[in-house]
C-alpha cells in the first residue's frame, strides 16, 4: 500500500467532485455544505457539533486556555487508531484518517490534506473552518491571528510526539504565546460515557511455530545491546504497540487491521515490566510470561494507566532510559530528567525487529504464497465476471477478502482494501464504500491494493489490470511503472545503502518522458504485525538497507480524472552474488502474482528487464502452481499458466536503461549513503 506522503494537489478536489457525476462548484452541490448562504446549507451527512464544542469550551475555561489542539493519533503514535482514540473525528464529525483540529473561544478549524477535502465538506457543519495547508507553521500562523499575546494553547502531551511538541513550543514561545501540557484529555471529559471503552479482547501468545525467536531470546538480545551501548542505559522504554507485541510474541485486536493491544514495556537490566490491562491475560498466558516469579526473566504485569507514574518513580534512582524518539509521546518524555535520557530515533527493538531472521523470512514467504492464491483466484474471477456488469468496487473488495478468508492462518485484512476503477484509481488512497462506488468495466483500468494478516506474516500487493483495449498511453505508462518496479527489484547496491539513495531507480523510466508519482516508493512490512513497518523503506528517516529486511516496492502513475496505475511487490533484502569480492545487496521478490500482459509494451523493455520478468513468471509457476494443483483449483491454475507464458521481444528497445540509469540517478542524488 502506498504510504500517505501524497502531495496536497488541488486537482484532487476536482477528481472527487467528478467521481460520481459531472463536476459542479461546491456551492451548487447538494452533497457538501455551503456556509456562505443564509441559513447555511448542510447535507444529511453533516454532523451537528454545537453541543460538544460548547462543552469543550467550558472545559477550556477551567484551564484558562485560549485554544486547544486535537490531533488524530493515540498515545503510541500509531498509524491506525482504535475507536476510543477517535477524538478528532468525534469533535469535528469528520472521520477521515488524517487531520488536526484546533478550537478557540470563538472558532474551530480543521487542517487536512487533499485526499479528504470533499469528505470534510460533506461531514462537518458550519461550526468548522476547513484549512488545506497542513503544517505546524500554518496552524501556528492561524493561532496567532486568533489568540492574544500571552494566550495559552492547551494540548494532551500523550498525543504529541516529541518533535511535534518542540515545533509548536518554539513557534508559540517566539510569538509570546504559551503551549500548556494538560495530562487530562479535555475531549475525553466532554465525550464522557459515550466514549467507546478500551478494548477488552484476550491478549494471547503466538504459537511457537509462528515466532521467529522466543521472547526470552529477544529480551536477552536487547539487554546485550544495552550493555554494549556507549552510554550504558539501564532500561529501554517501548512505546510503539508493535514493539511490545513483537518482543513478547503477544497479539490481540485493539487496533483496526493491526493485531496489537494497548501496552508499554519498561525493560531494565534486571526486570521486565509490561503495562497493560491485567484482566485480559489468561492463566496460560500468565504462565507463558513467567509472571509469578521475580527473577530477571519474569514479566511483571502493571496497569496500563500507571506508566507515567512508574517512569517518574524509576528515574528517581541512578538510571538511564533508552528511548526511540519517533514513537515516544511527549507525555512520557517530559517526566524523564534530560540527564537520564538516552535518545535515538528508533528503539533497539524497532531496529532489531526490522531485520528478520531465517525463520521469520521463511514464515513471511509462506504467507505470500497463500496470499498469491487468494489474489489469483480473485483476478481470475474478475476476468470472468466483470464483462457481465455485475461487479462494483465495493463488492470486489469484499470478494477478495472472502478469498483470503479461505486461506490457512488468515486473521483479517492488513488495511482497508483500495479497489478503484477508472478515474477513482487516480486517487492514490481511495477506498469504496457501500454507498459510494463505481461499477467495474471492461473499458477501464482497475487498481487493487490489498493485503492480509496471517499468523505467519503480513502481506500487501497491488496489481492494475484492464479487461478491454487499453490506449497506447495507458500501455506506455503501465510499462514504465513496471520497468521502475523491475529496475529497483533487480538492483545491486552496496550494503548499508540508504533506501532514499536508490529510490530514483523506480522513477527513472517515468522521468524519462516527464511522468512521476507523488507517494512513497516503499515501506517495511512485519510478521503478523504492521503493514507499514518502520523504519524500513525509501524515505528520509528510514534506516540503511540490511540483509533480512522486507520492503514493498511500489511505483505508480496517476492520470488526473482518468486512471491510476500502481504495481506493488514485497521484497526481501538478500546478499547479491557479484563477480568481484565485496558486500553487496539486492532484492528477492516474494509477492507471486503476474502482471497484466495486455498492458505491457514489450518493445519498451530491455533484454535484461525481459529476462527478469520471465524468470519471475517462472518462479510464480513453480511456487504457486503446485498449491493451486494440490487444492484442485484447476481453473485458476489454467489462468496462471496463461498469464505467465514467457514474453518475447517484438521490437528492439529504444533505449537501454542499464548504465545510463545508474549514472543519472546517482548523479541526481549525490550517492550519499
From Swiss-Prot:
Q: In which tissues is it expressed?
A: Kidney.
| Removed propeptide positions | 650-673
Catalytic activity from the UniProt record: Release of any N-terminal amino acid, including proline, that is linked to proline, even from a dipeptide or tripeptide
PANTHER family named among the record's database cross-references: XAA-PRO AMINOPEPTIDASE 1 (PTHR43763), XAA-PRO AMINOPEPTIDASE 2 (PTHR43763:SF4)
Gene that specifies this protein: XPNPEP2
Lipidated positions per record (GPI-anchor amidated alanine): 649
State the protein's purpose. Answer: Membrane-bound metalloprotease which catalyzes the removal of a penultimate prolyl residue from the N-termini of peptides, such as Arg-Pro-Pro. May play a role in the metabolism of the vasodilator bradykinin.
Where does the signal sequence lie?
A: 1-21
Q: Which PROSITE patterns match?
A: PROLINE_PEPTIDASE
Q: What keywords are annotated for this sequence in UniProt?
A: Aminopeptidase, Cell membrane, Glycoprotein, GPI-anchor, Hydrolase, Lipoprotein, Membrane, Metal-binding, Metalloprotease, Protease, Signal, Zinc
Which residues take part in binding substrate? 115, 429, 523, 532, 554
The cofactors required by this protein are: Zn(2+)
> In which compartments does the protein localize?
Cell membrane
Coiled-coil annotation: which residues?
A: none
For this protein, the Enzyme Commission number is 3.4.11.9
Q: How does it sit in the membrane?
A: Lipid-anchor; GPI-anchor
Q: Which cysteines are joined by disulfide bonds?
A: none
Q: What is this protein called?
A: Xaa-Pro aminopeptidase 2
How its function is modulated: the record gives: Inhibited by apstatin and the metal ion chelator EDTA. Potently inhibited by the converting enzyme inhibitors cilazaprilat; enalaprilat; L155,212; ramiprilat and YS 980. Also inhibited to a lesser extent by indolaprilat; quinaprilat; spiraprilat; captopril and zofenoprilat.
The protein's organism comes out as Sus scrofa (Pig)
Q: Which GO terms describe its molecular function?
A: metal ion binding; metalloaminopeptidase activity
Amino acid at each position: 500500500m502506498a504510504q500517505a506522503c501524497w502531495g496536497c494537489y488541488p486537482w484532487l478536489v476536482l477528481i472527487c467532485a467528478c467521481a460520481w457525476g459531472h463536476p459542479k462548484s461546491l456551492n451548487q452541490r447538494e452533497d457538501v455544505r455551503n456556509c456562505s448562504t443564509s441559513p447555511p446549507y448542510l447535507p444529511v451527512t453533516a454532523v451537528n457539533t454545537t453541543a460538544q464544542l460548547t462543552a469543550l469550551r467550558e472545559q477550556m475555561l477551567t484551564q484558562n486556555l485560549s485554544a486547544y489542539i486535537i490531533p488524530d493519533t493515540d498515545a503510541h503514535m500509531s498509524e491506525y487508531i482504535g475507536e476510543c482514540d477517535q477524538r478528532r473525528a468525534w469533535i469535528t464529525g469528520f472521520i477521515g484518517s488524517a487531520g488536526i483540529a484546533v478550537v478557540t473561544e470563538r472558532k474551530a478549524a480543521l487542517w487536512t490534506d487533499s485526499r479528504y477535502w470533499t469528505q470534510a465538506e460533506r461531514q462537518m457543519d458550519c461550526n468548522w473552518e476547513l484549512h488545506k495547508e497542513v503544517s505546524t507553521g500554518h496552524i501556528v500562523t492561524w493561532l496567532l491571528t486568533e489568540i492574544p499575546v500571552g494566550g495559552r494553547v492547551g494540548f494532551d502531551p500523550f498525543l504529541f510526539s516529541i518533535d511535534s511538541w518542540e515545533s509548536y513550543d518554539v513557534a508559540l514561545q517566539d510569538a509570546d504565546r504559551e503551549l500548556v501540557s494538560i495530562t487530562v484529555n479535555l475531549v475525553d471529559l466532554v465525550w464522557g460515557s459515550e466514549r467507546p471503552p478500551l478494548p477488552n479482547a484476550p491478549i494471547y501468545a503466538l504459537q511457537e511455530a509462528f515466532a521467529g525467536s522466543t521472547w526470552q531470546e529477544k529480551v536477552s538480545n536487547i539487554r546485550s545491546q544495552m550493555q554494549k551501548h556507549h552510554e550504558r542505559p539501564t532500561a529501554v522504554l517501548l512505546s510503539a504497540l508493535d514493539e511490545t507485541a513483537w518482543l513478547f510474541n503477544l497479539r490481540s485486536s485493539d487496533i483496526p487491521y493491526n493485531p496489537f493491544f494497548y501496552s508499554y514495556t519498561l525493560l531494565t537490566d534486571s526486570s521486565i515490566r509490561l503495562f497493560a490491562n491485567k484482566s485480559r491475560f489468561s492463566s496460560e498466558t500468565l504462565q507463558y510470561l513467567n509472571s509469578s516469579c521475580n527473577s530477571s526473566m519474569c514479566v511483571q504485569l502493571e496497569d496500563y494507566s500507571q506508566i507515567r507514574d512508574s517512569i517518574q518513580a524509576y528515574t528517581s534512582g541512578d538510571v538511564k532510559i533508552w528511548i526511540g524518539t519517533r514513537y515516544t509521546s511527549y507525555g512520557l518524555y517530559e517526566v524523564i530528567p534530560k540527564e537520564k535520557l538516552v535518545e535515538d530515533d528508533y528503539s533497539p527493538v524497532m531496529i532489531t525487529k526490522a531485520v528478520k531472521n531465517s525463520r521469520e523470512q521463511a514464515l513471511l514467504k509462506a504467507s505470500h504464497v497463500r496470499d498469491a492464491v487468494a489474489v489469483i483466484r480473485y483476478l481470475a474471477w474478475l476476468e470472468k465476471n466483470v464483462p457481465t456488469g455485475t461487479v462494483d468496487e465495493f463488492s470486489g473488495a469484499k470478494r477478495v477478502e472472502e478469498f483470503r478468508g479461505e486461506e490457512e492462518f488468515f486473521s483479517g485484512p492488513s488495511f482497508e482494501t483500495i479497489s478503484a476503477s477508472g478515474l477513482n484509481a487516480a486517487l492514490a488512497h481511495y477506498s469504496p464504500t457501500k454507498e459510494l462506488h463505481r461499477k467495474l468495466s471492461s473499458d477501464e483500468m482497475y487498481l487493487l491494493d490489498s493485503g492480509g494478516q496471517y499468523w505467519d506474516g503480513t502481506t500487501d500487493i497491488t496489481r492494475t489490470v484492464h479487461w478491454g483495449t487499453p490506449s497506447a498511453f495507458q500501455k506506455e505508462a503501465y510499462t514504465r511503472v513496471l520497468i521502475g518496479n523491475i529496475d529497483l527489484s533487480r538492483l545491486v547496491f552496496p550494503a548499508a545503502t540508504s533506501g532514499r539513495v536508490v529510490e530514483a531507480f523506480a522513477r527513472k523510466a517515468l522521468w524519462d518522458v516527464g511522468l512521476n508519482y507523488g507517494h512513497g516508493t516503499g515501506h517495511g512490512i512485519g510478521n503478523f504485525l504492521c503493514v507499514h513497518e518502520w523504519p524500513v523503506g525509501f524515505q528520509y528517516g528510514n534506516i540503511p538497507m540490511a540483509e533480512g529486511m522486507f520492503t514493498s516496492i511500489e511505483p505508480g502513475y496517476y492520470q488526473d480524472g482518468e486512471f491510476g496505475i500502481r504495481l506493488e511487490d514485497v521484497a526481501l533484502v538478500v546478499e547479491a552474488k557479484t563477480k568481484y569480492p565485496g558486500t553487496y545487496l539486492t532484492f528477492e521478490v516474494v509477492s507471486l502474482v503476474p502482471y497484466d500482459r495486455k498492458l505491457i509494451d514489450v518493445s519498451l523493455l530491455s533484454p535484461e528487464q525481459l529476462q527478469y520478468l520471465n524468470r519471475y513468471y517462472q518462479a510464480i509457476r513453480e511456487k504457486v502452481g503446485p498449491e493451486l494443483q494440490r487444492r484442485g483449483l484447476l481453473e485458476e491454475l489454467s489462468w496462471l499458466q496463461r498469464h505467465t507464458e514467457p514474453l518475447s521481444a517484438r521490437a528492439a528497445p529504444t533505449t537501454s536503461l542499464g548504465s545510463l540509469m545508474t549514472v543519472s540517478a546517482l548523479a541526481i542524488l549525490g550517492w550519499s549513503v
